[in-house]
C-alpha cells in the first residue's frame, strides 16, 4: 500500500514539475519562459541555444577567455541563423541578430532601461547617461544634447586639427615608421576628448593619462571576468573574491576625472576673477565664451541646481569613456583597412587632395562633409568592426515583439550589432570590405536598422557626429603626409569581448612619407 502511495505521489510530482517547467525553465534557476501570442512553440520563432551544462545556459561562458566569450555569440548566430533565446540564472535572454527585431527593440519607448549586465559598470560609471534610466536619463539627455550642436562641434574643429598635427609630430624626421595603433590612437582620442569635452589640455598630465588608460583596461578585465562567471554576478561574492584590483583601478580613473573637473573649475574661476568676480561677470562668462566645453554645461547646470557634483562626475566619466574608447576603435580599424585596401586608400587620398588645402589649419566641417569616399570608407569600417558589438536592454513589463514573441518582465535583450552588420539577409558577401555599399543608390532599399554602429532610437549615441568629425580629421591629416601600408594579416586577427570591440593581437601599420 505504501509503495502504491509513493508511486502515486511521484507521478503527481512529475506532473507538477512538468506543468511548472512549461512556464519556467527550472534548471535555468526558474527563469520564466518566453511564450508566443498564438500559443505556438516559441522555439519556432527563436531557437533555443543548447546549454553547456544541465543548468540551461547559466554556465555557457564560464571558463572562457575574452576571445571565447566573443566567439560564443558569433557561433550561436551562425549555427542558428536567426535571433535566438537562452535561459540563464533565472532570466530569459533574447538575442537579436535581425534588423526587424532590432528596430522593434530600439524604438520601443518602454525598452529604454539598460540590461542587468550594465549594473556591473555602476561602480565605474555610476548612473551617467550610458547607464541611467527613467526620468534621470531623460533629464541628462536633454541637458547634454545642446553640447553636440553643430555650432559647438564647429568650434571643436580647431582642437581636432591641433591634436591631429600633434599626432603627426611624433613621426617628424622619419620617412617611414611601423606603429602599433593600439598604443598611439587611444592616446590621441583621450587628448582630444579631454580638450574638447572637458576644456582641459593633457600636455602636463600625459603620464596620468597613460595611467588612466592602463587602469581602464583593468576595469574592463574585471567586467568580463564577472560577466562570464555567474558566481560573481552577486555583488557580495564579487566584493569577497574579485574586487581588490578592481577597487584600486577605480580609484585611479575616478581620481583622473576628478582632477580634470577641478582643473576646469579653477580655469573658469580664474576667468571670472579676471572679469571682476561679480555675478554679472560669471553670467557673461557662460554666455559669451567662444568655445564652450561640455563640462562647462554641467558646471553651469550645477549653478542652476539641475545637477550636483556627483552627477558631474558621473557624466564626465561616461563622456570620457565613450568619447575616448569607442572612437579609438573606429580609428584603429579604419587605419588598418586603409593599409589593407590600397585602391580604396588612393581613392580617399585623391578626394582629399581635390578638396582639402595643404594648410590644414583652415580645415572646416564643410570641407570634411565633401569627402564622401572617406565617409563611405569609415561607414564600411564601422559595419565590419562596430565599436560596440552588442547592446543590452531589460524589459520592465511583459513585452510583445513584432514576430509574435512575448518576453516576460525582467527579460534581457541583447542586440548583436556585430551579427546584424554581417547578416547576409541585408549585406551581399557580408565579409567583404566594400565602401560602395553606402552610395545612395546602394543604400536606399536597405533596412534602416541593418546598420546601427551608433545604436538607434531614443538612446542612440549622442556623440556620433563628434566621433565622425574626429575620425575624418585625423585621417585627412595622416593621408596628406603618409601612405599607409599593412603590417598585419587580417586572417590572424582574434577578436575579444570587452567594453568595446577588442583584438587579442596588436594592430600594426607602416607609415611611409609621401614625396
UniProtKB/Swiss-Prot annotation:
The keyword Endoplasmic reticulum applies. It is a peripheral membrane protein. Coiled coil: none annotated. One of its GO terms (cellular component) is endoplasmic reticulum membrane. Keywords: Endoplasmic reticulum, Heme, Iron, Membrane, Metal-binding, Microsome, Monooxygenase, Oxidoreductase. One of its GO terms (molecular function) is oxidoreductase activity, acting on paired donors, with incorporation or reduction of molecular oxygen. Heme binds at residues 322, 461. Its cofactor is heme. Its EC number is 1.14.-.-. Gene3D superfamilies: Cytochrome P450. It comes from the Eukaryota. The keyword Cell membrane does not apply. It is found in: Endoplasmic reticulum membrane; Microsome membrane. InterPro entries: Cyt_P450 (IPR001128), Cyt_P450_CS (IPR017972), Cyt_P450_E_grp-I (IPR002401), Cyt_P450_sf (IPR036396), Cytochrome_P450_Monoox (IPR050196). Belongs to the cytochrome P450 family. May be involved in the metabolism of insect hormones and in the breakdown of synthetic insecticides. PANTHER family: CYTOCHROME P450 4P1-RELATED, CYTOCHROME P450 FAMILY 4. This is Probable cytochrome P450 4p3. It comes from Drosophila melanogaster (Fruit fly).
